[in-house]
């Protein structure tokens, strides 16, 4: 009998599976926002897709997502 793989809980909280891959939030938007321009903060608002080169690593960290 094989041992079950463990999900890395930190990664499970950060990534969501979609039909096209994994979506993620953008970095640099949690604190020290006063020195960042409104344009920069606005552009950091949306969700992004995980790059293809990183997808295998995310899949290994979250095998059951």
Swiss-Prot record:
Gene3D superfamilies per record: 4.10.410.60
Keyword Nucleotidyltransferase: no
Keywords assigned: Ribonucleoprotein, Ribosomal protein
Gene Ontology terms: cellular component: cytosolic large ribosomal subunit
Matches recorded under Pfam families: Ribosomal_L35p
Gene Ontology MF terms in the entry: structural constituent of ribosome
GO biological process, one term: translation
InterPro entries: Ribosomal_bL35, Ribosomal_bL35-like, Ribosomal_bL35_CS, Ribosomal_bL35_sf
NCBIfam families named in the record: rpmI_bact (TIGR00001)
HAMAP family given in the database record: Ribosomal_bL35 (MF_00514)
Family statement drawn from the similarity comment of this UniProt entry: Belongs to the bacterial ribosomal protein bL35 family.
PANTHER family, sorted: 54S RIBOSOMAL PROTEIN BL35M, LARGE RIBOSOMAL SUBUNIT PROTEIN BL35M
Protein name per UniProt: Large ribosomal subunit protein bL35
Organism: Psychrobacter arcticus (strain DSM 17307 / VKM B-2377 / 273-4)
Gene designation per UniProt: rpmI
């Amino acid at each position: 009998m094989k041992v079950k793989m463990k999900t890395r809980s930190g990664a499970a909280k950060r990534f969501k599976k979609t039909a096209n891959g994994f979506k993620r939030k953008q970095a640099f938007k949690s604190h020290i926002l006063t020195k960042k321009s409104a344009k920069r903060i606005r552009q950091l608002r949306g969700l992004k897709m995980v790059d293809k080169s990183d997808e295998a690593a995310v899949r290994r960290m979250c095998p059951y997502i």
